[in-house]
């Protein structure tokens, strides 16, 4: 498994591939650990910058993939990325098993999915808006403190922006202040047109 370079150029363009996680959710697709290792090697050969390997701790096959990758996957171009969630509401970050599993994967980069639509915070997470921000900030700071580069994946960002424009921005600022390198603005439902995205990010 490769390690992150000391500095990341501001003008660099990177391809972030999600075949091994998001792609594995397609109907009829079921990767074995050996399949995932083989695909990762091919993606590395293509020059992909980041390979999202799966969700360690949540999916046993993904946990095993990262364990085998430590010894069997020698990447020349790509960084392996572990996908996961922030700490649970009301739980200390250093005691949260799903966060610790991200560390145990030994992936140099972690993508954290975070609720950026207030309706999903209240209805799905069933917690307060402030606690959700704390969950993001605590988890990012903890992982960065352990030497990981962190991307924050803002789920339902554009739908949430229509409902409450300020909250998604507050979440991004919280993540950045805690040390996140990248904020991913996700059109989770796929309903945005390019012109609408351009207006919201301008």
Per-range role (PLM):
Residues 10-15, 22-51, 58, 66-75, ...:
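Alpha/beta enzyme core
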Residues 1-11:
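Conserved oxyanion/phosphate-binding beta-strand-loop segments in alpha/beta enzyme cores
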Residues 75-83:
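A glycine-rich helix N-cap at a beta->alpha junction
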Residues 4, 53-54, 82-84:
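N-terminal start-of-chain detector that recognizes signal peptides
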């Amino acid at each position: 498994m490769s390690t992150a370079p000391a500095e990341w150029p501001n003008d660099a363009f990177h391809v972030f591939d999600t075949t091994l996680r998001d792609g594995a959710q397609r109907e009829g697709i079921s990767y074995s650990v050996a399949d995932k290792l083989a695909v990762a090697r091919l993606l590395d050969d293509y020059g992909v910058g980041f390979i999202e390997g799966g969700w360690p701790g949540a999916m046993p096959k993904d946990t095993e993939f990262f364990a085998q990758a430590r010894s069997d996957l020698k990447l020349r171009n790509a960084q392996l990325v572990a996908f996961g969630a922030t700490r649970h509401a009301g739980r200390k970050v250093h005691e949260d098993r799903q966060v610790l599993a991200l560390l145990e994967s030994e992936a140099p980069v972690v993508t954290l999915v975070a609720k950026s639509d207030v309706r999903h915070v209240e209805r799905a997470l069933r917690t307060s808006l402030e606690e959700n921000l704390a969950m993001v900030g605590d988890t990012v700071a903890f992982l960065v403190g352990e030497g990981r580069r962190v991307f924050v994946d803002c789920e339902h960002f554009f739908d949430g922006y229509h409902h409450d424009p300020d909250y998604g921005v507050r979440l991004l600022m919280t993540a950045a202040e805690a040390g996140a390198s990248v904020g991913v603005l996700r059109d989770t439902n796929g309903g945005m047109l390019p012109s609408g995205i351009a207006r919201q990010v301008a």
